[in-house]
Swiss-Prot record:
Functional summary from the UniProt entry: Part of the ABC transporter complex SsuABC involved in aliphatic sulfonates import. Responsible for energy coupling to the transport system.
GO cellular component term, pick one: plasma membrane
Family: Belongs to the ABC transporter superfamily. Aliphatic sulfonates importer (TC 3.A.1.17.2) family.
Source organism: Mycobacterium sp. (strain MCS)
Organism phylogeny: Bacteria, Bacillati, Actinomycetota, Actinomycetes, Mycobacteriales
Official protein name in the record: Aliphatic sulfonates import ATP-binding protein SsuB
Pfam families in alphabetical order: ABC_tran
PROSITE patterns per UniProt: ABC_TRANSPORTER_1, ABC_TRANSPORTER_2, SSUB
Oligomeric form and interacting partners: The complex is composed of two ATP-binding proteins (SsuB), two transmembrane proteins (SsuC) and a solute-binding protein (SsuA).
Protein origin, superkingdom: Bacteria
GO molecular function, one term: ATP binding
Length: 245
């Protein structure tokens, strides 16, 4: 196992009387892809915001790499900037001169398959294209840790499948650590090295996904792991239920 790039110990975060994270411990190794599941209100997004440095009100110990980036469900593109300018905006505080920023931005757009959309306005992009620009904006920072907060939740099914393949290829090529927050059990199994479930502000289940890539629903071991994860989430799948395979 590689050295940990994320180490969380005894993390607590409350909002008023509501304890959202309660003495949570978590490690993520260098280059590891971890998917995080949990019911609404379980603390997934709160944890991600803390790791991203967007929430400084928690107690406990958090060690994260300096170079990290976040992709949210909403692409959050600036509508008055073209796609390339949205990507290079992430480098505004990084120090490189303008030509270098432009070259890195174009390379990031090319990496997500949008080299021809550099001059496009955000409102002219499809939902999938806008999310790929958002992903390029994260990648251009060359993060050691990529934090994903349900980035595919607003996309249609076919676009989600394309984004799964893109994300897996980027992760395999860049060898960065990934924490992927999702409500979709199948998505977690398809993408991750490891799946953790949050419940009552703590990790209630931590399971490695020992299935070879590429994965698909119906693979040997897929359904068994799916049932384990659903049970941990309090969902019992009905016998004979057809998921459209």
């Amino acid at each position: 196992m590689s050295a940990a790039v994320v180490t969380v110990r005894g993390l607590r975060r409350a909002f008023g009387a509501q304890q959202v994270l309660d003495a949570l411990d978590l490690d993520i190794a260098d280059g590891e892809f971890v998917a995080m599941l949990g019911l609404s209100g379980s603390g997934k997004s709160t944890l991600l915001r803390i790791l991203a440095g967007l929430d400084h009100q928690a107690d406990g110990s958090v060690v994260v790499p300096r170079s990290r980036a976040v992709v949210f469900q909403n692409p959050r593109l600036l509508p008055w900037r073209r796609a390339l300018a949205n990507v290079t905006f992430a480098l505004a505080d990084a120090g490189p001169d303008a030509p270098s920023r432009t070259a890195r931005g174009r390379a990031a757009l090319d990496e997500v398959g949008l080299a021809d959309k550099a001059d496009a306005w955000p409102l002219s992009l499809s939902g999938g294209e806008a999310q790929r620009v958002s992903l390029a904006r994260a990648l251009v920072r060359e993060p050691d840790l990529l934090l994903l907060d349900e980035p595919f939740g607003a996309l249609d099914a076919l676009t989600r499948l394309k984004m799964y393949r893109l994300l897996h290829d980027l992760w395999a090529r860049r060898h960065m650590a990934v924490l992927h927050v999702t409500h979709d059990v199948d998505e977690a199994i398809l993408l991750a090295d490891r799946v953790v479930v949050l419940s009552d502000g703590r990790v209630s289940l931590d399971r490695r996904v020992d299935l070879p890539f590429p994965r698909s629903r119906g693979d040997e071991g897929f359904d068994d792991l799916r049932r384990v994860l659903l049970a941990e989430l309090g969902v019992r799948e009905e016998v004979g239920h057809d998921r459209g395979r």
